[in-house]
């Protein structure tokens, strides 16, 4: 008895579909970077396009490919999530002969050691994001992204408070910036993503450092009293809007990646969870290094 291949059946009302696939696949991944193995639990989404002449995509092939590539990554160590995403992307096009486009997205939580001002060591969580896209015959593009949390302090409220307090206590005006002024503050969540050609490497740790260094202050999982005071003082000596965070990151990207091509895409997204409002503050820039360089030259 001949088995019917329902997916390959022709249909009359056919329209091409941009992405068809599976989402939310969780797999263990070992990334070898900086001389050490990083054990991550990755969430993976994979897609291919579907021509108008085909009823369905062969979903089981996607699971098979992911399983094969994860197994191979244990034996042949991968350097990054985006490298693994790219390898999966290529294999998707090999197995889905009807597809002209493939896309893989991956995310994982990642921990780095940090030190508080007193020297206490802590392991702090960050989020890694990777994406790879390939068009048959047109090569591969990959994206590396990070998400970090920290603290911002509002500069507008700070100046207003300083003005009002100086009216009541004139001596404060003489101190100027020597004493940090009170303000409302926020937990900030910022994402930085860069899309580069297949052969270009961008280090995730560098992106995390850029994001953390652009906030009013990093935050930590554990803080004793002195460290807690230092975090608060540091943030209020370095007040920032979400707009400031995004612009500071863009400036650091230009300095750090002078040799990358103008075509490299950059996305910076920052959101602060307001403490005195019921809404959040948000800022974003989606651009290329070329556009940023043109803006800098003006």
Predicted regions and their residues:
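N-terminal intrinsically disordered, cationic/polar leader segments
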Residues: 1-298
């Amino acid at each position: 008895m001949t088995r019917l291949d329902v997916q390959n059946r022709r249909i009359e009302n056919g329209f091409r579909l941009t992405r068809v696939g599976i989402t939310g696949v969780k797999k263990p991944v070992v990334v070898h970077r900086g001389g050490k193995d990083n054990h991550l639990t990755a969430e993976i989404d994979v897609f291919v396009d579907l021509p108008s002449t085909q009823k369905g995509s062969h979903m089981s092939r996607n699971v098979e490919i992911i399983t094969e590539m994860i197994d191979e990554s244990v034996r042949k160590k991968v350097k990054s999530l985006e490298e693994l995403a790219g390898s999966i992307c290529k294999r998707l096009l090999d197995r889905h002969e009807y597809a002209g486009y493939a896309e893989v997205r991956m995310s994982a939580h990642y921990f780095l050691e940090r030190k508080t001002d007193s020297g206490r060591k802590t392991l702090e969580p960050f989020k890694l994001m990777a994406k790879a896209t390939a068009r048959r015959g047109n090569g591969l593009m990959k994206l590396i992204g990070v998400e970090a949390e920290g603290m911002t302090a509002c500069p507008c409220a700070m100046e207003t408070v300083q003005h009002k307090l100086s009216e009541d206590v004139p001596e404060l005006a003489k101190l100027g910036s020597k004493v940090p002024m009170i303000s409302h503050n926020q937990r900030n969540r910022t994402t930085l993503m860069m899309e580069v050609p297949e052969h270009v490497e961008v280090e995730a740790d560098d992106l995390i450092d850029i994001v953390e260094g652009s906030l009013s202050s990093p935050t930590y999982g554990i803080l004793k009293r002195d460290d807690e005071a230092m975090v608060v003082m540091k943030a209020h000596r370095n007040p920032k809007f979400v707009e400031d965070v995004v612009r500071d990151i863009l400036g650091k990207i230009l300095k750090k990646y002078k040799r990358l091509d103008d075509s490299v895409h950059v996305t910076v997204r920052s959101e602060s969870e307001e403490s005195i409002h019921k809404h959040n503050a948000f800022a974003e820039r989606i651009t290329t290094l070329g556009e940023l360089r043109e803006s800098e030259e003006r």
